[in-house]
């Protein structure tokens, strides 16, 4: 290929990329997943509406992840609604599709499935996306309990993004042996499983300082940003580094 032909080829590629980014920026997207809202915003494709849990007070809110305002979403006439199997309810997905909306259902339970679904999301909006690889970190070789609710105490099971993210850092989630992805258990059971540490995320339920004392005779407890543990997407590469740095000293 001559220099002029090569230059024309590069120019066409730049024009195609520019058009794809232009198309993405003007798509009307409703996001019912906080991590998707964060990722789309980082891509320069801010949703026209999102949930009240998306930490975007500047955007129009259409309810929560478990109770979205379906009629309000339909009235917005979006080009695309994004949901996640792990985050949203199937009945809301069915209601949105029955209303004739284009709904993209993601199902992220690991770093691998995250990358697959980020490509699907990018493809759905015409965005040229290169997956940001998560840098491998040294294994921490710890066993951890991760409380996400109190009364009753609940944790995360094996087939969840948070558990798989910890696994990537060499941390074994002691609740992986339960059949449920959100098992209920009492602290005597936790103590019997002998975790090395207790990782206390800031969400979905923020455990008060007074309640941390209940872990005192089990293992050291450390608070972490729940978004780093449970929100997948553009934040994940840096989230792994932050969590690893915080947990490796314990």
Label the predicted regions.
Residues 10, 14-250:
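N-terminal ligand-binding lobe of clamshell/alpha-beta domains
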């Amino acid at each position: 290929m001559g220099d002029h032909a090569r230059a024309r080829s590069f120019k066409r590629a730049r024009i195609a990329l520019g058009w794809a980014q232009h198309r993405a920026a003007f798509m009307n997207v409703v996001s019912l997943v906080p991590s998707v809202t964060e990722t789309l915003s980082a891509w320069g494709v801010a949703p026209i509406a999102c949930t009240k849990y998306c930490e975007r007070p500047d955007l129009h809110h259409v309810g929560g992840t478990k109770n979205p305002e379906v009629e309000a979403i339909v009235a917005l006439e979006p080009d695309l609604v994004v949901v996640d199997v792990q985050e949203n309810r199937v009945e809301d997905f069915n209601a949105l599709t029955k209303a004739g909306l284009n709904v993209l259902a993601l199902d992220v339970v690991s770093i691998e499935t995250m990358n697959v679904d980020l490509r699907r999301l990018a493809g759905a909006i015409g965005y040229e996306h290169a997956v940001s690889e998560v840098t491998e970190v040294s294994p921490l070789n710890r066993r951890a309990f991760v409380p996400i609710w109190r009364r009753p105490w609940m944790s995360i099971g094996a087939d969840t993004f948070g558990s798989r993210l910890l696994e990537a850092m060499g941390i074994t989630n002691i609740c992986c042996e339960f059949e449920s992805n959100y098992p209920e258990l009492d602290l005597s059971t936790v103590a019997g499983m002998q975790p090395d540490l207790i990782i206390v995320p800031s969400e979905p339920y923020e455990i008060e300082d007074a309640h941390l004392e209940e872990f005192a005779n089990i293992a050291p407890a450390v608070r972490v940003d729940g978004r780093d543990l449970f929100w997948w997407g553009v934040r994940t590469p840096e989230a792994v580094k932050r969590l690893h740095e915080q947990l490796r000293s314990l």
